[in-house]
């Protein structure tokens, strides 16, 4: 109990984004369309990733950020809460969608990322 009382809380202020990942043989050229091999979604965002990493290492973590009132926002909150992150200070934005990161991953593991920050801003 004493150790828990003395434990410092790490506060992370940052982004929560849903990562939308498509695997492709290579990155497309401007104006080009490629066929990808498969598509995946992952909870992400620099802030959320840091919060989860710290929580997994045993720290008490509080996340401050903003997501939309949408499926991606619900998924992100559930994901970080699963790892023990306190989301009491993550706001839900009625008018703006949750941020997304569009990620292309090529056959060599190199990525390109375009972020639409949405509610993070």
Q: What would you call each of these model-derived segments?
A:
Residues 50, 90, 99-101:
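Short, charged beta->alpha transition segments
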Residues 88, 92-93, 103-121:
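Conserved phosphate-binding/catalytic loop of the ribokinase/pfkB sugar-kinase fold
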Residues 66, 100, 105:
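Glycine-rich nucleotide/cofactor/substrate-binding loop typically near the N-terminus or early
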Residues 2-66, 71-82:
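Glycine-rich phosphate/adenosyl-contacting loop at the front of the ribokinase-like
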Residues 40-47, 94-96, 120-121:
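Short C-terminal domain-edge/linker segments immediately following a structured domain
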Residues 79-95:
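A glycine-rich helix N-cap at a beta->alpha junction
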């Amino acid at each position: 109990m004493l150790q828990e009382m003395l434990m410092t809380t790490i506060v992370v202020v940052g982004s929560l984004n849903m990562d939308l990942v498509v695997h492709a043989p290579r990155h497309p050229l401007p104006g080009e369309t490629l066929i990808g091999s498969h598509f995946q979604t992952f909870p992400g965002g620099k802030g959320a990733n840091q919060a989860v990493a710290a929580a997994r290492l045993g720290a008490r973590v509080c996340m401050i950020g903003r997501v939309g009132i949408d499926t991606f926002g619900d998924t992100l909150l559930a994901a970080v809460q699963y790892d023990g992150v306190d989301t009491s200070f993550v706001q839900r934005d009625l008018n703006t969608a949750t941020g997304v990161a569009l990620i292309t991953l090529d056959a060599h593991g190199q990525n390109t990322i375009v972020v639409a920050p949405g509610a993070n801003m």
